[in-house]
Amino acid sequence: MIATAQKLIPLYNNNEVKGSIPCNRKEKIDTSGGRIHISHVTEPSLTIYRPANINKTRSAVIVCPGGSYINLSMTHEGYDVAKELNKYGITAFVLKYRLPNDSCMQSKEIGPLQDIQQAIILVKTHAKEWGIDSSKLGVLGFSAGGHLVSTSLTHFNTCYADNPLDISVRPAFGVLIYPVISFQEEIAHAFSRGNLLGKKPAQEKMDLFSNEKQVTPQTPPCFLVHAEDDKTVPVKNSIRFYEALVDNKIKAEMLIYQSGGHGFGLVNPSTKETWMDKVILWLQLNGFYQPDK
């Protein structure tokens, strides 16, 4: 099953974003190396990838590329992933989210979270039109995009987006690929932390956005992927989050590769197996996906 032509839609009507500040930043697109990297995002959007056939699985995933909260790796952590999900009959939405910036946001640590919550609201609002079951809408993120996903999985009780219909912003499940999870000094990815919270954040704020500390019995089920030799984001980020999930009796599975480093996207070069196949089996096990036979 292949993807249909994608469609890009603005995340907000007329780009009217609560808590935003008018600024002169212009979006930058870098295509060097054959991949698209976007920075200075001020007009967030969703790019919809729908399966070629009617989405009989009715499953959907919002994909959040990584980039240390300073840019977005849109190709190998976004568009390529959406196309792969389409092969399984899953509708995918690649989220181009705003990156933290004091000149454009009243609270820069809230901007990305507000965008993923708005994306969830938007998809659920159009669920019938797009052939989606809202109870099968999950989130998937890489690196700093994994931090954003883990934040959406643990901070859903407060909605920062306009939500007049009081639509739940709790994802059904989360898939986290070499994610930034913790902002605690010993395992933090300092660059992502600094971009989101500033150079010298208070311990209270670091704790709030160290999402292993925010897991509760209401946190959605999760699948984690990491490489043991990741020198950029230590594997203990995933391990601590997994332990918190287990402590709270949340359904969870974790795949730790012996090697592979950081930023490998869909394919870990150290192995012929793919983590996506394992994710699909896990989704099926937990009732979030039924193959289109």
Model-predicted segments: where are they?
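Short amphipathic alpha-helix adjacent to the substrate-entry channel of hydrolases
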Residues: M74-F93
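Short beta-strand/loop motif that positions the catalytic acidic residue
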Residues: L224-H226, D230
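C-terminal catalytic histidine-bearing segment of alpha/beta-hydrolase fold enzymes
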Residues: V235, I239-K293
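Short beta-strand element of the alpha/beta-hydrolase
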Residues: T57-G66
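Catalytic nucleophile-loop/oxyanion-hole region of alpha/beta-hydrolase
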Residues: L72-G78, Y97-S134, N268-T274
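Mobile cap/lid helix-loop segments that gate and shape the active-site cleft of serine hydrolases
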Residues: K28-G33, P179-Q214, P220
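Primarily recognizes the serine-hydrolase "nucleophile elbow" in alpha/beta-hydrolase
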Residues: Q118-A188, M206
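N-terminal cap/lid segment of alpha/beta-hydrolase-fold proteins
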Residues: Q6-N55
